[in-house]
Amino acid sequence: MHKLEDLKFINSYARLPEAFHDRPMPAPFPQPYRVAFNEKAAALIGLHPEEASRAEFVNAFTGQIPLTGMEPVSMIYAGHQFGVYVPQLGDGRALVLGEVQTPEGARWELQLKGSGPTRFSRGADGRAVLRSTIREYLASEAMHALGVPTTRALTILGSDMPVYRERVETAAILVRMAPSHVRFGSFEYFAHGGYPARLKELADYVIAHHYPELAERYQPYLALLETVIRRTADLIARWQAVGFAHGVMNTDNMSILGLTIDYGPYGFLDAYQPGFICNHSDHRGRYAFDQQPRIAWWNLACLAQALLPLLHEDEAAGVELARAALDRFNGQFASCWTALMGAKLGLLETRREDLDLIERLLGLMAGSAVDYTRFFRALGRFHDPAWLPDLRAAFRDPEAFDAWLADYRARLGHEGREDAARLADMLAVNPKYVLRNYLAQMAIAKAEQKDFSEVERLQRLLERPFDEQPEMEAYAALPPDWAEEIAVSCSS
């Protein structure tokens, strides 16, 4: 494990021409203090956890005293926001410091979120508030523990500096990590802005640094598109399986690596509602839970359109190649999602006919507003007479559930497994704990009073979502009535 000064930064993105980024310096961040620190993320870059206690740590990761090799840049990109194309966006409050390369050869790009205004701030203050940084910090680590590809969070650094949103809040900086923060919108900017050479340069950069195995393909840019489609299908299937709604799936919030990125007004399902809208600014439900696969395809189509000049010199031929790649998305998503849901039901192998079993169950759950996480966690014990009454009681029509359960028993019978083995497998994929909005809100309320203990407690809990952790049982309870009044939006 390294000392802070031994971390060796490079910034490969900064080596690209000025058209790709700006070079602002981090704004002053008065009297900073540490709010939270993630030892698991620190281990990814070989940073010794004791280093987080040093003043130099806070100074380095608020951008005040750079470490060797740090070269801050803010990325430029465009994006479709709620379906409307915005030709220039960019990092309005974020700076990529550079990458740390591990002895194993992995590279982690470190980014400050909330570091102050940049050329892309569009008149905003370039700050993030404590509330939103806590939500992103906890969510990224919760999603990682659930097996969902995601950016990671190293630390939150706070300040008493006031930030003006719907109310006066305090400033914070989130240090987040990913192999890359390049987005679909990065390609859209150069494609629609009329910069074909820059578009090719960006694609070559992404292939060289993140998909080197594609470089020798006969059609490397088509292979890039196909790979991103496949990764995105896998990502969205995992969102749907764990009951996660992102809330703002603009193309500038879509990772070229298939990671969950830019946690804003997200939410995990409480009661199973297919049309769940977690973002109260999403008045038409464009980004509702059940719309996420469709929107992912739409966003991929935007990426494909941006890449058309690279797919074939003849536009019509390029369109056909893109369509063929996009046509595979639905099958890739369905295959992954069905396998994940089959595992949640304890099936060793998912068959085509199992889709009906899955969809019937979800229909029953929707009709009775059954808690998504708690039900699947409990379902593994349906064979136990002590558990079955509570399972039945969750449904408004217990007889309909009985009919489904009979078919489910018969399906399990074909596999001939012992109940204990099946239960163990189900407990390993059906979490007991997820980051419900009210849990995050309780941690935020304490943190705003300078008590960060609940942030740490939730972090430790969510690192082990599949473990019983009996001392934390209260965190697996149904949400309280007041939780329904929590509204989250893009304000951060």
From Swiss-Prot:
Family: Belongs to the SELO family.
Cofactor: Mg(2+); Mn(2+)
Keywords: ATP-binding, Magnesium, Manganese, Metal-binding, Nucleotide-binding, Nucleotidyltransferase, Transferase
Chain residues that bind ATP: G90, G92, R93, K113, D125, G126, R176, R183, D262
Keyword check for Nucleotidyltransferase: yes
Enzyme Commission number(s) of this protein: 2.7.7.-, 2.7.7.108
Reactions accelerated catalytically: L-seryl-[protein] + ATP = 3-O-(5'-adenylyl)-L-seryl-[protein] + diphosphate; L-threonyl-[protein] + ATP = 3-O-(5'-adenylyl)-L-threonyl-[protein] + diphosphate; L-tyrosyl-[protein] + ATP = O-(5'-adenylyl)-L-tyrosyl-[protein] + diphosphate; L-histidyl-[protein] + UTP = N(tele)-(5'-uridylyl)-L-histidyl-[protein] + diphosphate
InterPro entries, sorted: SelO (IPR003846)
Task of the protein: Nucleotidyltransferase involved in the post-translational modification of proteins. It can catalyze the addition of adenosine monophosphate (AMP) or uridine monophosphate (UMP) to a protein, resulting in modifications known as AMPylation and UMPylation.
EC class (word): transferase
Active site (record annotation): D252 (proton acceptor)
Chain sites annotated for binding Mg(2+): N253, D262
Name assigned to this protein: Protein nucleotidyltransferase YdiU
Superkingdom, natural source: Bacteria
Gene Ontology MF term list: AMPylase activity; ATP binding; magnesium ion binding
Pfam families: SelO
HAMAP family tied to this protein: YdiU_SelO (MF_00692)
